[in-house]
C-alpha cells in the first residue's frame, strides 16, 4: 500500500467506544460478533453469510440511506392488505370501500363483472375464511389483538363493547342476510294498513309488555304499543323483521271472524297470509342458528311458539319453546349474563330492550305450560325469577303468575314421581301454596271480570288477563288433584281432591262462557279452550263415582241440572266458535262433550228408578276411546265376588286382547242405553278416528260402542292396581288407518295433539302416559 493510501485509510478511521468489537454487518443484524480464533480477520456470522466483515473503526462503505424492503415480504404484505380490504368490505361496506380504493388490485377486480358462478365460489371461499378467522380471533387471542378485528367488525353506530347490548357478529355474509331481509320485507302489509289492524284488538299492548314488567312499562322502559305499527327498514337484520312479522300475525289471530280484511291489503285470507309468514320466518330465520342467535331472534322464537299454541299446534309450540330455552342457556340469560345477549335493532332505544331476566321468565312460563298439557318434562326447573328479590317490583298479578309457573313445574315433577306416597305429599304441599297465593289476592280480585270487547285501551287487556289468570289457577287445581279424583270411595283422604276438582271445574266454566261470548276468535287465547274441555270432562267424569261410601254428600238433583246447563252452554259456545271460525279444536271439544253428556242421563234415570229389572241393568263398565291411546274401560265397584280382594283387578273378559291395569273406578246405574246408538250412528269413519267414544255395558252383556281409534299394546305399562279401583284396555290390531300420526303433525292431522292422552293418563294416576 502506498503512503498516500495509508494516510487516507488513517483519515477514515473512527473513534469507537472501548470494548466495541462487532463488525458493521453484525451490528445491523443485532447479533453477536464472534471469531473462531484470535488471529481471524472475518467473524463467524460474516463467514456464514459470505459478507464483508469490516470493523466499526472504519467507515461503512456499504451503508445505504434507507433499507429497501424484502421483495417477498412486500408481496406478503400486499396479499394481507388485499385480504383485509375484502374482509372489511364484507363487514363494513363503507369502510371496506375506502380501503379498497387504496388497493390497486382490489380496484382492478371491481372493474370486472363477475359471473354468478364466480361470485358464488368467492362467497363460499370467503365464508370458509370467516370460519377460520372467527375460530382464531377470540377476545384474547394474539391474532385478534394484533389485527384489531374485534372492534373493526362493529359498526360505529353501535354501543361500546362494555354495553350490555352490543351487536353480535354473524357468520353469514351480509349479502346473504340482505337477501333474507328482502324476502321478509316483501311479506309486510302496506304501512298504512298496520294502524288499522292494531286498532282492532288489544294485541299490541300484550306483545310490547310480554318480556317486561308493569313497572318497566310505567317507567318507560318498554316500547309503546304504537311501535308495533312501524315496519322496520328493509336493510334491518332478519330477526328484527321476523319479530315484527310475528307480532303482526299474533295480532291477526285476535281478529273476530267476519273482520273486513280489505283495508289490510294482504294476499289471500288471513289464515293463508299467516301460514305464509310463519313458514317463511321458520325457514329463513328461526331454523338458522347463525341468524337467530340475537336478542330479537330469541324473542322471535317465543312469539313463534305463541302463534303455534294459539293455532292449536301444541307440539310445534313446545319444540319452539324448547329451542328458545336452549338458545337462552347458550346466551347465559339463565345466569343473568348480558355479554352474549346481543340486540341488532339500531332503531330501538337500547334501554327498551328486553332484559335477560324477563326473557328467561317468559320462556320458562311458556315451556312449562305446554309441557304440562302434553305430559312432557319441563326444560328447566330454575325458579330464580320467583324469589322475593326478583318479585319485589312486581304487581300482585305478576307475582301470582310467577307462582303459577313455579307450581306448574312442581306438578310436572310430581307427575313423574313413581312413589304414590311421595306424590300425594307433594300434591298436598302444592295445594297449600295455591291456596296461600289465592288468599293473597283478596276476595274482590276473584270476582268474575267484565270488559268491553270494543275497548281500545289497556283496560280491556288487563281484565282479560285477570280472567285468564283466574282460569289458570283453577285449571292447575284440576290437574293437581285429577289423579285422585276417582280413587276408592272408601278412602276418605281423597274426598278433598274429588271436591276440589268439581268446584274448580265449575269456576273455569263460569268464566269461559262470558270470555268466549266476547272473544269469538278461535285463535285468540287458545288455552282457555283447553281449560274448558278439561273442566267439562272432569265435571262429567266426577258423576261416575259412587257416593254411598264417601263422606261428602252426593250432588243433588238441582246441582246436577245446574251442571248440565253449564256444560250445555259451554258446548254451545264451542260449537259457535267452531262454526264461525271453521276451527277443528273447538269442534272436537264440543263433540267430546256431546259424547259424554249421556253420563248425566244415565245417572238421572238410575236415581229416578226408571229401571226395569234393575239388577240386570246395573252399569257394569263405561268405555272411552281416546285417539292414539286406546279404549279405556271404567268398572264400578259393585258386587265384588266373595273371597275376591278389593285390590284384585277384575278377571279378563273373553276378549284376549283385554289388559288389566290400574284403575279409577266409576259407579252408577243406568237403563235406556238404546238411546245412545241413534245419536252416534251418523258419525263418519274419519270423524270417528279422531273422537273418543262412550260405551256402556250392562250385566246382561248388551253394549254399544263407536270405534274411534286403535291402541298399540306396546305402549301400555305393566299391570297394577290402585286403591281397589279398576280399569283395563281393549287391544285392537293396527290396520294402517288409525296409526299414530307424525310427532310434529299439525292440528289438521292431530286435533288435540295428545292433550286428551295426558288427561286420561292423569286420571288414571299417571300410569298410561307414553311419552306425550
Swiss-Prot record:
It comes from the Eukaryota. SMART domains: GAL4. Keywords: Antibiotic biosynthesis, DNA-binding, Metal-binding, Nucleus, Transcription, Transcription regulation, Zinc. InterPro entries: Zn2-C6_fun-type_DNA-bd_sf, Zn2Cys6_DnaBD. Residues 100-121 have a biased composition (Polar residues). Pathway: Antibiotic biosynthesis. CDD domains: fungal_TF_MHR (cd12148), GAL4 (cd00067). The keyword ATP-binding does not apply. GO terms for biological process: antibiotic biosynthetic process. SUPFAM superfamilies: Zn2/Cys6 DNA-binding domain. Pfam families: Zn_clus (PF00172). The keyword Transcription applies. Residues 94-121, 156-180 are annotated as: Disordered. Residues 23-53 bind DNA. Transcription factor; part of the gene cluster that mediates the biosynthesis of sordarin and hypoxysordarin, glycoside antibiotics with a unique tetracyclic diterpene aglycone structure. First, the geranylgeranyl diphosphate synthase sdnC constructs GGDP from farnesyl diphosphate and isopentenyl diphosphate. The diterpene cyclase sdnA then catalyzes the cyclization of GGDP to afford cycloaraneosene. This is Transcription factor sdnS. It comes from Sordaria araneosa. The gene is sdnS.
